[in-house]
Design a protein with these regions (language model features):
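Cell-envelope/ECM-targeting effectors and their regulatory/trafficking segments
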Residues: 3-6, 141-145
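Metzincin-family zinc-dependent endopeptidase catalytic domain
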Residues: 1-88, 92-95, 106
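The catalytic-center signature of Zn2+-dependent metalloproteases
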Residues: 74-144
């Protein structure tokens, strides 16, 4: 959460999150769900109005993480949680293999060695700062009404 708040302060001038121990009244609720082989490792349940404003609360489901090659369970959990929190902020998938919000299915050519190296590095060392350009682009259109 601290990482996301630092990114939000830099991009938007405000903090995005405040920790709350109770689900009641929370705007973003994180739930841990059983892992299933045919399901994604995380999922953001959210809805938006016609103007694109997200309705609250947003529910984030995170599956039990498993190590992926040289990437630890803890890193996988952080990467998936950070990605789903990005959706809670309204961020879509991106084609940037270095972004925490990568990737739209089929949008990145992992057969390209340079692209693959960047993608793997971003999964092994996920960085929420990778979404700064997306946040800076997304929110001003809501705040300038």
């Amino acid at each position: 959460m601290d990482g996301w708040n630092a990114v939000a302060r830099e991009a938007l001038g405000v903090e995005a999150f405040r920790w709350q121990d109770r689900e009641e009244g929370a705007e973003v609720v994180v739930r841990f769900v059983p892992a299933a082989a045919d399901q994604p490792r995380g999922y953001a349940h959210l809805d938006a109005d016609d103007a694109g404003v997200i309705r609250l609360p947003v529910h984030l489901d995170l599956a039990e993480p498993v190590a992926m090659g040289a990437t630890s369970r803890e890193t996988v959990l952080f990467q998936v949680a950070a990605h789903e929190i990005g959706h809670a902020l309204g961020l879509p998938h991106t084609d940037d293999p270095g972004s925490i919000m990568c990737c739209r299915e089929g949008a990145v050519n992992l057969g390209d060695p340079g692209v693959r190296a960047r993608y793997v590095e971003a999964r092994r060392r996920p960085d929420v700062r990778s979404v700064l350009p997306q946040l800076r682009e997304l929110y001003p259109r809501f705040w300038q009404r």
